[in-house]
C-alpha cells in the first residue's frame, strides 16, 4: 500500500485552538506527518499564523491583521498568535504546509519565503493556496515545493501548470473520484485533498489512491492508516461508519 501522508489542518483544532504552537505540537503528538498552517503578514511585514483577515473569530478583537503590528498582535492575544519563525522553531524536524490565503503579490510571498530560508527550513516546508498565490511563491522561490489548490472539476490550464510547476494538486475532497484521481496521477502529480473529517470520507479517498489527506481529525486518520497497514489491505476497512 502506498504511503498516505497525514496532514493536520491548522494543528489539532478539535482539541486546541487552531494555528497556535500548542495546536501544532498536539497534532504532531497525535501522529501527523505534517501540519498545515495559515500565514499572513502584519502591518509591519511579519508573517504570523492566522487564517482570517481579522482577530475576531479566534481572539475576539475585531481588528484587521493588516492594521496591526506584530507587537500589537502579541499584546492583543497574550502572545498566542505565533510568528512563522516561532512556528518553524517549534516544529523543528517536521514538515509544514504553508497556506497563504491572503497572498496576492510577490513581495508578500517573498517575505514568507525569506523567513523560511532564514530558519533553514526550505527542505521541510511546502506551500499551498490558489493560483495567484502560488504564482507569487514560484516567482519568489524557483525551488519551492508547491501544492496548487484547486476547487473546480475544470482542470488547471497547461500554461498555468507550466508557470507554477506544482508537485501536488490540492483538491477539495468532495471533487475527487476515480477518474479524476487516475488522470492527475497519469499527468505526473501527487494528489492532496482537504478537509475530510469523517472515517467514511477518509476511507473513500484512501481507496482512490490519494497521496495526502489534510484533516481536522488527524488522530482518526492516523488510526485508520495504522489499522490498514496492520491488516495488509488497501481498503481502510468497511465504509459503513460515518463518525
Predicted regions and their residues:
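Phosphate-group recognition and catalysis centered on beta-loop-alpha active-site segments
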Residues: 1-243
Amino acid at each position: 500500500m502506498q504511503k498516505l501522508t497525514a496532514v493536520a489542518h491548522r494543528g489539532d483544532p478539535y482539541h486546541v485552538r487552531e494555528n497556535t504552537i500548542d495546536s501544532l505540537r498536539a497534532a504532531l503528538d497525535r501522529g501527523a506527518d505534517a501540519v498545515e498552517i495559515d500565514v499572513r503578514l502584519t502591518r509591519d511585514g511579519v508573517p504570523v499564523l492566522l487564517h482570517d483577515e481579522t482577530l475576531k473569530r479566534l481572539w475576539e478583537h475585531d481588528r484587521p491583521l493588516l492594521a496591526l503590528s506584530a507587537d500589537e498582535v502579541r499584546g492583543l492575544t497574550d502572545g498566542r498568535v505565533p510568528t512563522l519563525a516561532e512556528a518553524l522553531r517549534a516544529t523543528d524536524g517536521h514538515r509544514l504546509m504553508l497556506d497563504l490565503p491572503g497572498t496576492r503579490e510577490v513581495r508578500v510571498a517573498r517575505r514568507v519565503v525569506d523567513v523560511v530560508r532564514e530558519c533553514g527550513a526550505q527542505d521541510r516546508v511546502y506551500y499551498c493556496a490558489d493560483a495567484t498565490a502560488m504564482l507569487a511563491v514560484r516567482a519568489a522561490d524557483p525551488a519551492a515545493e508547491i501544492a496548487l489548490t484547486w476547487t473546480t472539476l475544470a482542470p488547471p490550464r497547461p500554461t498555468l501548470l507550466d508557470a507554477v510547476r506544482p508537485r501536488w494538486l490540492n483538491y477539495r475532497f468532495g471533487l475527487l473520484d476515480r477518474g479524476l484521481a487516475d488522470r492527475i496521477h497519469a499527468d505526473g502529480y501527487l494528489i492532496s485533498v482537504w478537509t475530510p473529517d469523517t472515517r467514511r470520507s477518509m476511507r473513500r479517498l484512501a481507496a482512490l489512491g490519494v497521496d495526502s489527506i489534510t484533516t481536522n481529525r488527524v488522530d482518526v486518520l492516523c488510526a485508520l492508516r495504522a489499522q490498514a497497514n496492520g491488516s495488509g489491505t488497501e481498503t481502510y476497512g468497511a465504509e459503513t461508519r460515518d463518525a
